[in-house]
Amino acid sequence: MTAIKKTITYGQHELTLETGEIARQADGAVMVSYGDTVVLVSVVGKREVKEGQDFFPLTVDYQEKTYAAGKIPGGFFKREGRPSEKETLTSRLIDRPLRPLFPEAFYNEVQVVATVMSSDPEIDADIPAIIGASAALAISGIPFYGPIGAARVGYINGEYVLNPTASQLKETALDLVVAATESAVLMVESEAKELPEDVMLGSVVYGHEQMQIVISAINELAAEVGKEPWDWAPPEPNTELIAKVEALAGADINEAYKIKSKSARSSKLDEIRSRVLGELITETTSTSEANEIKSIFHNLEAKVVRSQILNGEPRIDGRDTRTVRPISIRTGVLPRTHGSALFTRGETQALVVATLGTGRDEQIIDALQGEYADRFMLHYNMPPYATGETGRVGTPKRREIGHGRLAKRALLAVLPSQEEFGYTIRVVSEITESNGSSSMASVCGGCLSLLDAGVPLKAHVAGIAMGLIKEGNRVAVLTDILGDEDHLGDMDFKVAGTESGITALQMDIKITGITAEIMRVALSQAKEGRLHILGLMKEAVGEQPQELSEFAPRIITMKINPEKIRDVIGKGGAVIRALTEETGTTIDIEEDGTIKIGCTSAEAGEEAKKRIEAITAEVEVGQVYDGTVLKLLDFGAIVSLLPGKDGLLHISQIAHQRVNAVADFLKEGQVVKVKVLEVDDKGRVRLSAKALIEAPSAEAPEEPAVAATGADQQ
């Protein structure tokens, strides 16, 4: 049981790849250590293909164990349950660059499992997990055109930073993850603070250059301990069958792709496909042969669409390569929501709703690095009817979680700070029609709904999806791609941003040979399309946000001395409970003394604020108060000045004349005017009533006299 290790310095920490000791029954298993973050990645592939399988069943599961951070799971069962959003997003992040590197027609089931076993709070486990998956596949013998490397790139003070720590990410203007083979970038995922195109492209190139050391280390590991490659070869093309399908359907497919309506085009293609299958499938045809016919038909579709575009012919819906589909914008479409927008771009449509809440509505996330609150949520839903299909409705799928996260990244850079706008914000994008680029429609609709709700965004944000088709030296970059162009093309390239720069970038490339120059052209063309959409958005809603929705809660923010927090809360929470119940508000108090009062009416909020001010007010020397007599003593009286603030009115300070009995001048419950003479270093307050009463003349008869207010003045 000999462990083989490869250790390199990668960025600010050492990266170690270790295999041969743990999980030896997997086809490939690598323990990746990066700083104190440790991830075990295993790969298993099935040698036999399931009968009738017509797609590649790759499964990637990234899982975080709470013991990795020295924690015990919360809840009743005390064990890890369903995947968190972070686990789902990281699973997708690993899957996306791996999937294009398996051979075409390889349909054996492959499962990648990445388990976080130790978590350094400064080092995210996603980069080690991608590297581990690449290394495990490289040594497994499973057909795989890797390995790949991965890098996180930050941008701090005008400099690129390789694999920035969690602390550095708080300062960075960019958080970009790039994965690539030795020669080609495959995947980019990023969010940025309105950075220009050349900085974004430079970060991709920088990350690709830096990860070469990782790819070399994986190659060395595979050369040393790699298993015998599988005896697998792609099936020989059935030229006779291809010719038959082309003869039966080629011309008809060509005509079908001149139909601009998606539903009409799909119906026509279904009809052609059914006719071809009907003519070529007999009772003796096996499932695998039937699947081969379907695959040939699909490849023929791709050939038709790609050749039309590369030959300079109009695209499927009649556009040229740079034109954005017609756009329709409506805001305020739902009467009782806080903000809403209907964004339609061609046959893609998003109904997006913004809701404002108080601090109590923040999402509490129990992450490995510790618990934190998220004040901005964006949820993306795409029901089956959006594509004219039936299907399951309910729990969001991985794709929906990923698209929601991308749209959220795009809008984060323009949100007002907590101090500027104290609301919790939730945006929900309901995709009601889909024919390409629904996540970018969610960005546009999300921005519009936030403006409709009255959120003071720093700038308008729009998103656009780009595509690419490449055959040899012929390249076509497509603006605002359709679903078919995404499916049949070589690249899906989503860019969101403001007039000033990019806020989110996501790229998935299915082929090699995409150069930096091609990416530069795509980014430039995307900017052109983005600015066009931003112009239409501003035309529709103007530059400024609407007034805050009348249905949104009002939030009043005030600041008190942190030492007074306990006075506002009261013993056992009695004071704050009474405040919220009597005023109908919600009150959130932070450790620094910031208080946020959430209310449905301004009057209720002001009443709560007034009462908190009274509770936290300080007694000032020389000030006059209307005090209530709480208790009579032999030597004076205890007078309440403010909630929780009492003072002593000494018998000598009640009146100018001699006072033999306090009860002759005061009674409990009486309201009297008193002046604060002194507050000593222990907080004791000395009061005077006679200081507010004119001294009697020498001839005046002696009688009880004390300044009274309100009902006490008789």
Curated annotation (Swiss-Prot):
Gene Ontology biological process terms in this record: mRNA catabolic process; RNA processing
Instruction: State the GO CC annotations.
Output: cytosol
- Give the principal location in a single coarse category: cytoplasm
Gene3D superfamilies with a match to the protein in the record: GHMP Kinase, N-terminal domain, K Homology domain, type 1, Nucleic acid-binding proteins
| Compartments in which it is found | Cytoplasm
Keywords attached to this entry: Cytoplasm, Magnesium, Metal-binding, Nucleotidyltransferase, RNA-binding, Transferase
Q: Which NCBIfam families match?
A: polynuc_phos, PRK11824.1
* Name assigned to this protein: Polyribonucleotide nucleotidyltransferase
* Recorded name of the encoding gene: pnp
